[in-house]
Amino acid sequence: MKIAFHLNCLEQGGAERVVSNLANQFAEDGDEVYILTEWKAENEFRISDKVKRVHVGLKPEDDKKGRITKFLLRIRYLHRFMKQEKPDVVAAFAHRAIYRALTASIGTGVPVITAVRTDPAGHYDHWDDKIQIPLLFPRAAGCVFQTEGQRDFFPAYVRKKSIIILNPIHDKYLNVPEPSVRQKEVVQSGRLVDFKNQPMLIEAFLEVHKKHPDYVLKIYGPDSKDGTKEILEHLIEQNKAQEYVMLMGGSDELEKQLPNASVYAFSSDWEGLPNALLEALSLGLPVVATDCPCGGPRTVIRSGENGILVPIKNKEAMTEAINLLIEDRELAERLGEKARELGPSITASSIAEQWRQYMKKIVADRRNR
């Protein structure tokens, strides 16, 4: 198949990670694959040389044009690609990219699959969404969701043509040897960004540290530039916690840096289906996670069986759960061992095959009209 993915850029984030994994896998399997982006960022995921990257965003000469003109040009450039290259299908990831792709597809005959990657409540319920969803979503050939909670937000006509597919993880997170001895570390991975509520995690760990002063907290993740990093740095400095609360920065080697930790702590207030959480579970880490909307953690964690779920924004519950996993190592290892079973079901190849079968069905349905 000739497959195109559309999103803003490939800067390290959840949707970008999924697109890079899927594109690389499809290309490896012999499909002709394009990634259509609006711009390039500094900290991007790597894509295979077999994947063709195409710029469909604004050109330098467009910078001085008005806002409406810029919007129309972005639609025009994407429409031109669809018209000229005639991909079998375009998969659009994330909010504005979805609207652009659905608009740009008019008159091309190219089916568009929408991929919602976040909690729709708060992201698809603004006044303009209430206009664009009924106007544009009927044009979608299909819709991919990560959780039931995401799907339930949308009207019946969207749900009817949708499917739930989990995110793929890189094979490097599979079959990582179990540590002979766990380090006295609590870890988290993910961008430093407001909705991940890392301040709450740090505040919870400050309480943990009073009881377990030999443990440290390491947070791996790039700066999202929204001010969260500065808030975290101030919180660490204010509590004189520099020796045991550490911001490690972004990393491409988490499969080497995370597995020996005693606890993986996930603190988000809302998410779609968090890739970082899937990776931690697949590594066999004992996990405590907030039961955040729209149900991502609950989709993959059965509390008390392969991890522990706690309420969002609840420092006390997070503190208690981390302490439990530190103190009851038998429970922690049992949870981690069960968590590891998730990995084989969400490999890049298995998830790509689910996407491929869904795409084939959509293409066949379109041709049979």
Predicted regions and their residues:
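N-terminal strand-loop element at the rim of the active site
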Residues: 5-13, 17-19, 25-65, 153-155, ...
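Conserved acidic donor-binding segment of nucleotide-sugar-dependent glycosyltransferases
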Residues: 302-304, 308-315, 323-329, 344
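Donor nucleotide-sugar binding/catalytic pocket of nucleotide-sugar-dependent glycosyltransferases
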Residues: 138-175
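A short, well-ordered alpha-helix in the C-terminal region of glycosyltransferases
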Residues: 317, 324, 331-345, 357
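Short His-centered aromatic/hydrophobic patch
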Residues: 92-98, 116
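Short hydrophobic beta-strand element within catalytic cores of glycosyltransferases
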Residues: 286-291
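A conserved mid-protein helix/loop that constitutes part of the nucleotide-sugar donor-binding site
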Residues: 16-21, 184, 193-210, 230, ...
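Aromatic "clamp/platform" in nucleotide-sugar-dependent glycosyltransferases that forms part
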Residues: 250, 269
